[in-house]
């Protein structure tokens, strides 16, 4: 199974331990909106929480041992939706960084 698919499945299954095993200890998510670096533990707790955005659909565009690209449609509690493109940097079988770009989808 691909690293990205495992990450997607672990998030869908709300499995925090398995989710964190896919990410390196020094992993961070570079937020597209602010440039802030969000560390693994902070991101994973949010994504597995009841306040997390819901993934409507996902697809892996490309993945090899060094990089992966995936596209998601997500929805938020307030009813807003986004199309999100994520680039994952992979090293030694773990994701070490991800960066996102998002487009708001009109209601």
Give a label for each model feature.
Residues 4-9:
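Amphipathic alpha-helical repeat scaffolds
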Residues 12, 30, 34-107:
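A beta-strand edge to alpha-helix "cap/lid" segment located at domain peripheries
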Residues 13-28:
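Short, well-ordered alpha-helical segments enriched in acidic and aromatic residues
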């Amino acid at each position: 199974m691909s690293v990205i698919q495992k990450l997607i499945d672990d998030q869908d299954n709300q499995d925090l331990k398995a989710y964190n095993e896919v990410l390196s200890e020094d992993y961070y998510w570079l937020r597209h909106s602010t440039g802030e670096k969000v560390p693994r533990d902070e991101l994973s707790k949010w994504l597995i929480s009841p306040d997390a955005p819901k993934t409507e659909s996902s697809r892996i565009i490309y993945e090899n041992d060094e990089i992966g690209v995936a596209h998601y449609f997500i929805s938020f509690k307030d009813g807003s939706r986004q199309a999100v493109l994520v680039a994952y940097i992979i090293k030694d079988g773990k994701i070490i960084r991800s960066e996102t770009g998002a487009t708001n989808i009109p209601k």
